[in-house]
Amino acid sequence: MPALACLRRLCRHLSPQAVLFLLFVFCLFSVFVSAYYLYGWNRGLEPSADASESDCGDPPPVAPSRLLPIKPVQAVAPSRTDPLVLVFVESLYSQLGQEVVAILESSRFKYRTEIAPGKGDMPTLTDKGRGRFALIIYENILKYVNLDAWNRELLDKYCVAYGVGIIGFFKANENSLLSAQLKGFPLFLHSNLGLKDCSINPKSPLLYVTRPSEVEKGVLPGEDWTVFQSNHSTYEPVLLAKTRSSESIPHLGADAGLHAALHATVVQDLGLHDGIQRVLFGNNLNFWLHKLVFVDAVAFLTGKRLSLPLDRYILVDIDDIFVGKEGTRMKVEDVKALFDTQNELRTHIPNFTFNLGYSGKFFHTGTDAEDAGDDLLLSYVKEFWWFPHMWSHMQPHLFHNQSVLAEQMALNKKFAVEHGIPTDMGYAVAPHHSGVYPVHVQLYEAWKQVWNIRVTSTEEYPHLKPARYRRGFIHNGIMVLPRQTCGLFTHTIFYNEYPGGSSELDKIINGGELFLTVLLNPISVFMTHLSNYGNDRLGLYTFKHLVRFLHSWTNLRLQTLPPVQLAQKYFQIFSEEKDPLWQDPCEDKRHKDIWSKEKTCDRFPKLLIIGPQKTGTTALYLFLGMHPDLSSNYPSSETFEEIQFFNGHNYHKGIDWYMEFFPIPSNTTSDFYFEKSANYFDSEVAPRRAAALLPKAKVLTILINPADRAYSWYQHQRAHDDPVALKYTFHEVITAGPDASSKLRALQNRCLVPGWYATHIERWLSAFHANQILVLDGKLLRTEPAKVMDTVQKFLGVTSTVDYHKTLAFDPKKGFWCQLLEGGKTKCLGKSKGRKYPEMDLDSRAFLKDYYRDHNIELSKLLYKMGQTLPTWLREDLQNTR
C-alpha cells in the first residue's frame, strides 16, 4: 500500500507530456521483450490434421525451446523387448512403406506392418511385462503426431518405459504448408524445397556404416524436400543440404547470404525433450543416402540389435571362361587389365581374387587375338581361383544318367590337369544353375564323385525375384550359396550401349541396387561373364567403381574368402538356412525350365491326412483307398503306410525320393493321390514344408477327445513294450513334474502335447487357407463312417462318388467298421487296431478334463472362425464345463 500511495503522488506531479513519454518507453520495452520471445524461435503452423487444408493463419507464439525442461532418456533395453519392428504404413501398397519393408527383409530383420491408425486401436505393445517391439517406424510422421490422445499417450509411455525409438518420414505435397511447426515439438519444417549438395554431419552419434567424409554434389531428386530447424539441444542434424535457388527460406532470416547455409534433411531427436529418441527424414527413400542413413538409424535406435557387422565378404565369379562367341572374348590386353585390376582391388579388399569358371571344350575357339588371350590367361593360372562348369556347357538336368554326367565332368577335369588349373577348390557352378534347385540328384552325386564338390551357388533359391529373398541351403553334403547379379549380363559389353544408357549402370553402382546388395548382405557372391571383361571391360569398370564408392561413403570392411571357407562363414551367420525348403517346381516357370522333363508334378499328392496319432487316421486311410479315383502312396519299408516326409529326416532326401512313393498318373484329371502321416499334425516344421511343395493340397485332420487320445497313446506304448510306459501308471505319466526323468517327460509330452488341438491347427492355418483344411469328428468316424466319408468326398471335389453305406460293414468282433467284400466277407485293419484295454481311472479323467479345458475352448473358437462344425465330443465337453 505505501508503494501504491507513492505512485499516486508521483503521477500528480507529472505533466501529461511526461506520462505519454513514460508510456512510450514502456511500450517500446514491451515490443523488444515480445520480439525476443516471438522471434527467438521462428514462427510456424502445426501440420495437424487440418493444416493441409489451409494456407493462411497467424502462427501462435512459441517460447524459446531452450526454456523447455529436459527429460532423461531411457537407455535401450535389449532384454526387455523382442527384436521386432512395428511399421505403420499408409496402405499395404504404398511405395515408401514397401521400400522400408524391403530394407528390413533384405537385412533379415523381423517386422510387422500395420495400417497407421488415425483413430482406433493401437496394436498390443507388451506381453507379460515384455515389450513386443524394439523399434517403431512411421511412413508418415504426421500420423504419429496427430494420433488421438489415448493412443499417443499409450505409445509414448511404451517408448519411454522400454527405451524404444521412432523413425518417421515427412513427405511434402502440394497442400503442405511452406513453413510450419511440428505439433507438440520444438521443431520447424520448411517444405516443398529443391535441394543440392548433400553432406553428412560428422558429429552425428547416429553414424555407424555411414562415413561422413564426402559431399554428394549435384541436385537431389525431387522438389518436395522438407528441411528441419530448431534451436533445442535435443535435435542433431544428420544430413544437410543447400537450397537450389538463391532465395532464402522464409523465417530463416533476410540475410542474402543465408541461402547458402546447410539445412537438415534428416534430423536426430536425442530424446532430451520428452525422453523418446527419434530420427526424422524430410523425404522418402528415393535418395540413396537416405537408405544408408536409415540403416544406421535402425541400428542406433535398437542399440545395434538390428544391425549387421561391418564386415562384408565379396566373391566375384566370372562364368563361361573360353565359352564366349568370337568378338566377345578377352584378348591379351583384356587379360592384363584383369590381372592389374585384381591387384588394384586388393588395396581395399585383402587378397581379392577373381574366381574363373571354365568349360574346357571351348578353349581356342575364338579369333587369333582371342586365342592368344586364352593362352595368356592360362599363363596366369596361379593368379586366379578356378572352378568348373560342364565340359560342353550343357545343362545338367538334361542328363538323366549319372554316369554320362560324370563323363562330361571328367573331360573338364582332364583339361584342367593338362593346363595346370587347380582341381581342389571344392566349388562348381552349373550352367544356367540347372540341377542345383530344383535338385537334380544325379548332378549332386556326380559332383561329389568327380570333383569332391562341397559348395555351389544359385540365383534360383527359393526364387530369382525378388533378389532379397534369395537364401542358401545344404543338400547331400553340398553347401548352396545365394548368388547375386550385378547389372551385367552376357550381352552388356559396351558402356555406351548399356540398356537405358550408361548413366543407368552408374546409378546401379553409386548408391543403387549393386551398392545396396553389398550394404544389406554380409556375404555376396556375384555372377559375371567372360564377355563382361572384353571390349569395354564393364566387369572391371563396375567393381572398381563399386569398391571406390563403398570406401568413400561407408565404414564397411571389405573382405574375401575362397568358396569353401566363404560357405562355412555363411552358414555360421545364417545357421537357420541349412535346411532346404522344397517347393513345387511347376509353380515357377524358371524352375520348371531347369527341371527334368522326365519328372511330373502330377505325381505329388493332392491330399494329406495329418493325424494326430490314435484318432482313426488308419481307418480313414483304408476308407479313402476304397474309392476308385483315390490312390494312396506306396508303403515304406521303414514306416509302413506312412511316408513321414515333411516332419523328419526323410525330408532331406529330396522331392525325387518323395515322388517315388506315387505312381506316374494314367489320367491326370481324375487320378487323386493322397498320403497319411499322423506325425504331421503336431510337427512345427511340417505345415510350412507341406505348403511349399503342395500349395494347393487339401488337408484332413481327425479329432477325438484329447484325454482319450492321450490314454490311447499310453496304451499303444505299453503294447509295444515301452519300458517307461510299463513302469509308470497313466496317472503318474500325465502328472509327472519338471524334475521327472527325461524319458518320462518325453512320454508325457507324446501323450499330452498332440492334444493341444487349437495350437497345432493354428500352425497349419498359417500355411494353408482355411478352406483347404477339413476337421473331422473322430467319434463320428467310428460310429457313422459312411456319413463322414460323404463329407470327405464333397470336400475333395472328386468327380465320382462312392456310396460308403454299401461298401462298409460293422464287424462286432473288431468293434469297428470294415470294408465289405464280395460274398459278405470283410477286410479289417490289422491286429494292432481296435485293442481292448481298461477304462481310464477317474482321477486321470478329472486331471485331463481340467488340463485340456482352455485348449478345448480355444478349439471351439477356432472352428467357429473356420466355419466348421464342432465335433460331438467337443460340444459335450463344453456343455459339461459350464
Swiss-Prot record:
Q: Name one Pfam family in it.
A: Sulfotransfer_1
> Mutating residue 751 to A has which effect?
Does not affect neither deacetylase nor sulfotransferase activities
The record places the following residue ranges in the Lumenal compartment, namely: 40-882
Coiled-coil segments? none
One GO-annotated biological process of the protein? inflammatory response
Chain spans, region Sufficient for localization to Golgi membrane: 1-169
Record organism: Rattus norvegicus
- This protein's major location comes to Golgi
- The protein's name is Bifunctional heparan sulfate N-deacetylase/N-sulfotransferase 1
Outcome of mutating residue 818 to A = Loss of sulfotransferase activity but does not affect deacetylase activity
The UniProt note on how this protein's activity is regulated states:
The deacetylase activity is specifically inhibited by N-Ethylmaleimide. The sulfotransferase activity is specifically inhibited by 3',5'-ADP.
Q: Which residues form the active site?
A: 614
Q: Where is this region: Heparan sulfate N-deacetylase 1?
A: 40-598
